[in-house]
Swiss-Prot record:
Name listed for the protein in its UniProt record: DNA mismatch repair protein MutL
GO molecular function, one term: mismatched DNA binding
Transmembrane spans: none
SMART domains named among the record's database cross-references: DNA_mis_repair, MutL_C
Naturally occurring in which organism (per UniProt): Proteus mirabilis (strain HI4320)
Pfam families named in the record: DNA_mis_repair (PF01119), HATPase_c_3 (PF13589), MutL_C (PF08676)
Domain of life: Bacteria
Listed PROSITE patterns: DNA_MISMATCH_REPAIR_1 (PS00058)
Amino acid sequence: MAINLLPPQLANQIAAGEVVERPASVVKELLENSLDAGATTIDIDIDKGGAKLIRIRDNGCGISRDDLKLALARHATSKISTLDDLEAIMSMGFRGEALASISSVSRLTLTSRTASQEEAWQAYAEGRDMTVAVKPAAHPVGSTVEVLDLFYNTPARRKFLRTEKTEFGHIDEVVRRIALSRFDVSINLTHNGKRVRQYRAAKETHQHHRRLSAICGNHFVDQAMQLTWEHGDLAIKGWVEHPLAPVQGSEIQYCYVNGRMMRDRLINHAIRQAYEGYLQGEQQPSYVLYLTVDPHQVDVNVHPAKHEVRFHESRLVHDFIYQAVLSVLRQVTEDTLSLDEEDNGALTATTFPENRQVAGENVFSQPYQAPVTSSTQKKSTGAYQGSAGKGLTDTQKSPQKTLDTRQFGESYQRTQGMLYQKMMQESASDVENKEKIPLFPPRPPLNLVDVGHTTNNNETNVISVVPRSVNASAAQTDYTFGRVLAIYQQKYALIESSQGLGLLALEEADFLLKCAQLLPENENLKPQPLLVPLKVTLSKDEINTFKQFQALISDFGIVIDISHGKATIHAVSLPLRQQNLPELLTKLLAYLATEKLCSKQQIGHWLAKQLSHESGVWSQAQAVGLLADIERLCPQYVRQPSKNLLQLIELQPVVAALNNERSKNANKT
């Protein structure tokens, strides 16, 4: 068959199949257009569940006469004009498909007037003909879109519409979601001539709570806890349900990304994971959350309906949401948790405490906040200021100011958000100090010590190496290996420092770094939850081995449940996250099966070998990064390197030999 270019009418109807699923889809697209036009008042009239009439009227900026015809054309929009605009979308719409798709399956009338025009103009388009007729009309500044007889020309699509009550229920839900995203906009909804919803514009905090109560119910508002969290370009605020409150169901789950209502699995997973251990069975958390992300870091252009987004750094966003929600849950249950600690000696693994800095988890500090007193509670106005799409308030942007809070439950108080503050302060001070240290500063003399390891003598070394032992000052703290000059035999680094030249074994350095990450002093590795738990089928012998060494395995941040012969890996520590976890688990159990008695040190060394540099071939850039990590995380190995880690090169005999040869040649001539 020959390939033909589709006529515009058919192309629009195909596009309508993605954009216009039901009357609620039409309402969503038209409401978003009104918000993009800057409307502060929107009136919605529905007849017969939207199948007969959908009319949306706003007081936005309007559309000029010259643009009316283009407004109904496909791929015509005023919201983006360049590729750069597409990569940083802040408007609700941007495709230019909605009006064209809607008009191809209905009888559409668009009436609009701008402030600069003395009269309004009306455009009419109907079904497959797509002929747009423009004529004068009477209308205030703003726009009105009337959609009559939806799917009148596509009987198959019309048959799929549900009952009038069901279709209006979907429209009502869309309006509720839009109303929660823009507190500053007044929205009125009428069905069959009867006013059903009236959301007045909310400027004050108590008005925000009134709208929240009207949409989510008094029960949610009474039990909800305010959440405010910020880190760099990421910010989240809103309300989450008290973990000890009775769960009503999953119908109150509203999430917005840069003001856009969203149904994203990554966000839902992060929230559910934060509530893990607080809910039972099929219970679902209730929440209303507003996530603000740098528009360059989120891709909205995923689906025509714009229900989904794609984050450029999804793991970072997931961890940020997870820690923000978990921090609030911990604050309100800290009294209960402290009692559990006294009884059990430690928190359960399901709470997943913050990981240690050396492991490098995505951790986020909350701005410091003074403890809330009874007097400040009375003055606090808290809650969400302004519309969701307009970013943070001045108070929320300033880490030095106390964030306003509101007490929704009987005992909830917002306390100092310091779960990660100390850790982040230490990290910031490390960076600041590093900037002040010269690239290759003079270092204290190295004290080479023999730790009893054997070295590989198979490689031929053409450089004469003479170990040198010099006492180092114990008071020195700024230790560095020096500068990496070259890579020798693909696994040794030739380094230069104030003490001369040295040859460093990169494989040994990598092994020591992995051991330091896996075996931190005086603490166990903290588990970091997986985005999706992994299931591994185990034999009976492997299950018995796991049960025998379960306590030791959990010390490395590995959280596993055994059920019906299958292991479910829920969390691992960050050093292990990039590994093939099912394969690593079976290898670990096979290793432990051969050891009757196995210590934590032995397991740590075994894991370090599994994590070692895969290729065994090192580049100079990799060597520089490795030594920087060793100097930062394991200064003891820099202060007193073992003989199988570093050997200083004595150049004096080589220089003497060269001078001797030159003297001989000079005598001959």
